[in-house]
């Protein structure tokens, strides 16, 4: 499997795809038509060399993905807002426009991302620490306490994902998430990008954000087993300060998993892919069409696969010496070749 380097995320009734600094958003409008927007996003650090260093690039990319995600989600939601609500800005919006002028949108975006990061740290890093403290009377070993803390952290994360997946709107978003993964898998496995080929591709992918967050949880257990401080206040501070480091390590793991095809990385990636059973669902053909439109707006998959324009879309690309068309993959289970 050849890595394409593209990635994306689901938005409201659509998909965002990013290829280097170029990104596209494809949305299924209420009238049934597909609206596609393309633009450039250079990132918070631009082309600075330090932002590309191992560990540092993980946190930078995480923040960039949140900013771009908020921006594209807002754009997709605009197609489903009431005309009256869209036409009349509220008092708070008027206040921000008066205070910050043209930079108001960027200020709101930055504040939203900052608030999201703070809430994530509180819920997934500090809350498990305080809850694990309830076991200090019964558990003397700091190693066991760190493991208990990690288990609580993963439990909160899994419960959160499971709860929101039961919401109707979120379920449709997860279906678009599945369509995004299917398109990338279709391309990277050498198949022409068509509805038929995308439909039979796997909805699980090693470079998924769900896998990244799960790996963050696992790595945090390892870190807190070996990094110990006596003061309770210092423990809280250490957990906050280590968030960028843990995120950086998790990013490097996901990056390696996305580029490597050896059995060890496949096995290590399995738990994260298992989490994708909650955050991805099988899309319908309309959703797949939206995903294809998003991909083709920023990525030349034909050039990537070395295909000619006249080659038929629905014929899978055969490997050298292969004469039979491969059987379709199973849709609802994770197979070894999907790892």
For each of these PLM feature ranges, what is it?
Residues 108-124, 205-216:
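Select subsegments of transmembrane alpha-helices in polytopic membrane proteins
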Residues 26-27, 35-37, 61, 65-98, ...:
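Short, charged cytosolic
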Residues 105, 109, 113, 145-153, ...:
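Residue-level signature of transmembrane alpha-helical entry/exit and packing/kink sites
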Residues 75-79, 116-141, 216-240, 244-247, ...:
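Juxtamembrane "helix exit" motif at the C-terminal ends of alpha-helical transmembrane segments
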């Amino acid at each position: 499997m050849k890595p394409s380097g593209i990635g994306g995320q689901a938005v409201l009734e659509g998909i965002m795809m990013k290829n280097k600094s170029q990104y596209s958003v494809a949305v299924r409008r209420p009238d049934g038509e597909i609206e596609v927007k393309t633009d450039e996003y250079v990132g918070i650090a631009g082309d600075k060399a330090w932002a590309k260093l191992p560990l540092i690039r993980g946190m930078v990319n995480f923040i960039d993905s949140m900013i771009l995600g908020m921006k594209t989600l807002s754009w997709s939601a605009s197609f489903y807002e009431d005309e009256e609500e869209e036409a009349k800005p509220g008092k708070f919006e008027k206040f921000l426009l008066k205070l910050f002028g043209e930079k108001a949108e960027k200020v709101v975006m930055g504040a939203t991302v900052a608030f999201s990061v703070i809430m994530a740290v509180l819920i997934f890093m500090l809350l498990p620490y305080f809850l694990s403290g309830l076991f200090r009377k019964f558990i003397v070993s700091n190693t066991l306490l760190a493991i208990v803390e990690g288990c609580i952290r993963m439990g909160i994360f899994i419960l959160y994902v499971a709860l929101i997946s039961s919401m109707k709107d979120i379920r449709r978003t997860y279906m678009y998430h599945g369509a995004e993964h299917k398109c990338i898998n279709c391309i990277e496995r050498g198949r022409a990008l068509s509805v038929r080929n995308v439909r039979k591709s796997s909805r699980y992918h090693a470079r998924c954000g769900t896998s990244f967050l799960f790996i963050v949880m696992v790595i945090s257990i390892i870190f807190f087993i070996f990094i110990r401080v006596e003061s309770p206040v210092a423990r809280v501070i250490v957990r906050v300060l280590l968030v960028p480091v843990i995120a950086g390590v998790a990013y490097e793991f996901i990056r390696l998993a996305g580029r490597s095809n050896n059995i060890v990385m496949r096995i290590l990636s399995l738990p994260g892919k298992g989490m994708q059973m909650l955050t991805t669902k099988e899309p319908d053909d309309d959703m797949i069409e939206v995903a294809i439109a998003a991909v083709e707006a920023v990525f030349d998959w034909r050039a990537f696969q070395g295909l000619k324009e006249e080659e038929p879309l629905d014929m899978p690309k055969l490997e050298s010496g292969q004469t039979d068309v491969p059987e379709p993959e199973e849709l609802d289970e994770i197979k070894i070749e999907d790892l």
